[in-house]
Amino acid sequence: MSQNEIKSYELEKHTTKDIHDSHINGSLIPIWRDWDKIITVQPEMVYVTTINPGEIKGPHLHIIRHSYYVCIKGRVVFIIKDESGKYIEIESSEEKPVLIEIPKNRSSAHINLSNEPSIILALVNPSWKPDNRDEHDVTYD
């Protein structure tokens, strides 16, 4: 597969259990494992970003940054413009986690569909730097 393709991967979600009485005490979601071979561009930075309820981040374009995103709290729709100009909508949430790969030179907007702040885990290459943000604002029709 090309590093220029927009891709998404449904992630596994496993319940975790208490050691004393086996009640469910949480969950575990593998984002990446070495044998999955879904991360084709090695991340140089991992960070957490938030989106307030009903808010939109973007749309903006990263010219040099290749990004992977997964919503780990709340519910977010990612709207990505592909190379033909078509809009692709991919939803990721804490209930149904989806890892979304957005190559450089593809614009995207991230919309919080939740009533509370949503939290997104981001894996990017190259690293974000305050003096070289690589965020170029664009507009969607």
Report residues per predicted region.
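Non-catalytic, conserved peripheral segments adjacent to functional cores
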Residues: 1-99, 115-141
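Asparagine-centered strand-capping/turn motif at beta-strand->loop junctions
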Residues: 110-113
